[in-house]
């Protein structure tokens, strides 16, 4: 809260009190350990970071504390962090797994800078090891997308169609109400999401500055499929009229037998943004990504994947010519 904190020392004699004061001031002069700073960051993060994100940070935070918990944060260097990341890489961790540990360290160090425990952030300059395996972004096949577009757009069937044509995350779509859908302006207002705490759905409304809060363009293909007339309530309610439980959602989705996940439809949407020539800066206003670096990275991945596919096709064509000759 910015106010000075008072600490009281007790002892059997004035000499013992002085000794305790000297020990305390000596420890204070050394600075806080990363574990102590992390406790403050976690308390703040619980108020500001989404529940699902915090859940994803739990194991990475444990790994960071195991490596650096007792280190004075002012003694932590970029080289220390890079050595930690290389050790993870040697264990066979994928790029995303290693990257999240760096993200956690970066957040802790940023917190330390704001509170005067650091003057610079050693995590910002740290680089990921080269050669890390990247988890492949699975784009749905044309057959899978055809199954989606052939669904009758009623009830829960509308969900995969909406995910494909808007790129909404599952939680965002599950929180949508008909009042959020403006057919005339061709806009869907995304202002909240459903988080699952175990099986229990919890609707979380975002602040105006939240990255996920956005207006998504209703494409002509989706406009044709959305029901006309005024409707109220959730687009995809559960049996009790409120948000679906996690179990209800899984059952409904499995019954569709699409053979793909909701998030794969988000990948398909982003791919179509790229193929349509939508600039990354504009695309992120539709996808809700929090920074342009992430959006550009996704675009680069799509381009590289398409280049690799083109190479395969050309090689197959060349080999066909060799067989003919």
Predicted features, each with a name:
Residues 7, 74, 117-120, 129-150, ...:
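DNA breakage-rejoining catalytic core of tyrosine-based enzymes
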Residues 9-10, 43-119, 134, 242-248, ...:
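N-terminal core-binding DNA-recognition domain of tyrosine site-specific recombinases/integrases
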Residues 95, 99, 114, 118-119, ...:
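Basic, Lys/Arg- and aromatic-enriched nucleic-acid-binding interface segment
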Residues 143, 193-196, 217-259:
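Active-site/catalytic core of tyrosine-dependent DNA strand-transfer enzymes
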Residues 172-174, 260-261, 270, 277-289:
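Active-site-proximal segment of tyrosine recombinases
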Residues 180-187, 278-298:
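Short, polar N-cap/turn motifs at the start of nucleic acid-interacting alpha helices
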Residues 185, 194-213, 220-222, 240, ...:
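C-terminal secondary-structure termini that scaffold catalytic or DNA-interacting sites
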Residues 194, 223, 287-312:
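Catalytic-site neighborhood detector that most strongly recognizes the C-terminal catalytic loop/helix
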